[in-house]
Design a protein with these regions (language model features):
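Beta-strand-centric surfaces of beta-sandwich/beta-rich domains
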Residues: 1-271
Length: 271
C-alpha cells in the first residue's frame, strides 16, 4: 500500500490576532500624488505555494477630503510588480465597518516576500492593507495565472473617467482600445474622482468587451459610498472567468442611486 501525504488548502495573512483599529499593514503614499511611496513588507515569506490573493483596503478615506489612490502588489526581494495600480481611494475607516476587497487568482511561490506600495492625493498618508493568501499542497481548485495587466490608468492615482447614470446605466466607456494579452479573468477597480462633498450612493459597475455599439457585459460589481467620502465594495470583488483575446476592447459603465457623477475605473486582466 502506498502512503500519500495529506493534501489541504492553507491560508496565511497579515491580519491582527487581536482586535485593532489599524488592521493589516500601514502602507504610506508617496510625497506627491503621482509618486508611489517606498515598498512596505506585508508578509515576510509565503508559507506555501499561493493560488489566490485577497487584498483588503481601509482607512484612507476622510470626510471632506479628496482621497484618490492606487496600490501596487509586489513580490520577491526585488519587489517585482505582480498587480499594478489597483484603485483603492476613499477606503473607509475601520470603525465605519467597511472596506474595499479584491481577489486575484495569481500564483506566488512558497518562501516569497509580499509587499505593497501606494500613491494618493493625500500624500505621505497611510492606508491599511490586509492580504489573505490561499494555497497549500492541493492542486489549485481554480485556474491560476502568473501575471496581471492593468488597463485604464491615466495619471496615477486615477483611472479612466466613468460617468455614472442617475438610476440608469451610464454609457459604456473605453478602458483600453486593445488588450496586450489574452486574459482568462478580469477584476475591476473603481473609485470616486477628486470628491470633497459627495452624497451617499449605491453603485452598480459593469465591465465588458467589444467594439463601440457592440459591447458585451462580462461582469458587474457593487459599491456604496457615504456622504463622508468613504467608498466600500459590497462583498469580495473577484472578477469573472472570461475568454478575452489579445487585442480586445475593454469597457466599463456605472449606474448610481443619485445624480450623475464622475468616478474613475480600471480593469485588471489575469494571464
Amino acid at each position: 500500500m502506498f502512503w500519500y501525504p495529506p493534501q489541504r488548502l492553507r491560508t496565511q495573512s497579515n491580519a491582527a490576532a487581536i482586535a485593532t483599529l489599524t488592521p493589516g499593514t500601514a502602507v504610506t503614499t508617496g510625497a506627491t500624488s503621482s509618486t508611489k511611496g517606498s515598498p512596505t513588507q506585508i508578509i515576510a515569506a509565503t508559507d506555501f505555494d499561493v493560488w489566490g490573493v485577497t487584498l483588503v483596503f481601509s482607512d484612507y478615506g476622510a470626510g471632506g477630503v479628496a482621497s484618490d489612490a492606487c496600490f501596487d502588489l509586489l513580490i520577491g526581494t526585488n519587489d517585482d510588480v505582480l498587480v499594478a495600480n489597483i484603485l483603492c481611494g476613499y477606503s473607509p475607516l475601520t470603525t465605519n465597518l467597511g472596506s474595499q476587497r479584491y481577489w486575484f487568482p495569481l500564483f506566488i511561490p512558497a518562501g516569497v516576500k509580499v509587499s505593497g506600495r501606494a500613491a494618493g492625493v493625500r500624500t505621505s498618508t497611510a492606508m491599511q492593507v490586509q492580504a489573505f493568501l490561499e494555497g497549500g499542497t492541493i492542486s489549485p481548485p481554480w485556474r491560476v495565472g502568473s501575471r496581471c495587466t492593468t488597463y485604464g490608468i491615466t495619471t496615477v492615482p486615477d483611472g479612466t473617467t466613468v460617468v455614472a447614470g442617475n438610476a440608469s446605466e451610464g454609457a459604456w466607456t473605453e478602458i483600453t482600445a486593445s488588450t496586450t494579452d489574452a486574459h482568462f479573468y478580469l477584476v475591476p477597480s473603481f473609485q470616486l474622482t477628486n470628491e470633497t462633498g459627495v452624497q451617499g450612493r449605491s453603485l452598480a459597475v459593469d465591465y465588458g468587451v467589444g467594439g463601440s455599439g457592440s459591447e458585451i457585459q462580462l461582469g458587474s460589481a457593487v459599491y456604496a459610498h457615504t456622504n463622508q467620502e468613504q467608498l466600500s465594495t459590497l462583498g469580495d470583488l473577484g472578477g469573472e472567468d472570461v475568454a478575452v483575446a489579445a487585442g480586445s476592447r475593454l469597457v466599463m459603465r456605472a449606474s448610481s442611486t443619485g445624480v450623475s457623477e464622475d468616478y474613475n475605473g480600471a480593469i485588471h486582466g489575469v494571464t
